[in-house]
A protein has these predicted regions:
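Short beta-strand-to-loop element that shapes/binds the nucleotide-sugar donor at the catalytic cleft/hinge
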Residues: 60-64
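Short, conserved active-site loops that position catalytic residues or coordinate cofactors/metal ions
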Residues: 5-40, 142
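Structural motif
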Residues: 24-28, 59, 115, 137-139
Length: 234
């Protein structure tokens, strides 16, 4: 059982010093460039060293492992406590890649964390399942062609995830970074804690207990989920 702490998020360029007071760092980098399989081990070693040095939780850039596109969460002690494989693929850039088949929600002192890889954020049923599993924070790293980017891609992705599931959501992308919250607890009741930008660092404070003030959402039927789990996860 964890006593929930305030999460002080810093979105910034890889391996640069985190914003003062941050306790969780989300690397932006160039999310269009996934760390290749042959470089992943050394990259993660550097990430673990960074987290340990600055005593922060860290969500690195996406990386490849045995054909899967992955994200992971590293503790301030420099240990990987969980990883998530992409369940759905962005086929123009991932031909031949493998698809994951399971979701993992990681328990932290801030609350439940779910890592949403690439286009999984545009599958609301998947994020809903993660929320039912206890996720209070959704972190998404994705890529998209410049010609595909519009405000609709933000609203239908991480913003929608926050509104539909009463969770906090942070996204990094080669076209934008932003942080979202349910309308009722966002400062201007627009669903944003940090509006889309490419400037870094982006710094935001969040507390999972604040989600209790949100209007209650309808729960997903566990019986319905059990019957259709295969379809929900693709």
């Amino acid at each position: 059982v964890f006593e929930l702490r305030e999460l002080s998020l810093s979105i910034g360029e890889p391996f640069t010093s985190p914003a003062w007071g941050s306790n969780l760092v989300f690397f932006s980098g160039d999310p269009g460039a996934v760390i290749p399989d042959e470089n992943a081990k050394e990259y993660l070693r550097r990430c673990c060293k960074y987290a340990r040095h600055y005593e922060v939780y860290l969500i690195p850039e996406r990386f490849m492992v045995m054909g899967y596109t992955c994200m992971c969460l590293i503790t301030p002690q420099g240990k990987v406590i969980g990883a998530q494989k992409a369940v759905h693929l962005y086929l123009p850039t991932t031909p031949g890649n493998k698809r994951g088949a399971a979701l993992e929600v990681m328990n932290t002192e801030f609350g439940g964390v779910f890592l949403c890889v690439d286009v999984d954020i545009y599958h609301p049923e998947l994020v809903r399942v993660a929320a039912e599993m206890g996720a209070q924070y959704i972190f998404c790293a994705q890529q998209m062609a410049r010609s595909d980017y519009s405000s609709h891609m933000v609203i239908s992705g991480i913003w929608n995830a926050a509104q539909q599931n009463n969770v906090f959501g942070a996204a990094v992308c080669n076209q934008f970074h932003c942080v979202c919250a349910p309308l009722s607890i966002s400062p201007y009741e627009d669903g944003f804690l940090a509006k889309p930008t490419l400037k870094t660092p982006v710094t935001v404070k969040m507390l999972a207990d604040d989600l209790e003030r949100c209007p209650k959402r309808r729960l997903l039927s566990r019986k319905l989920y059990a019957v259709h789990r295969g379809e929900l996860l693709g």
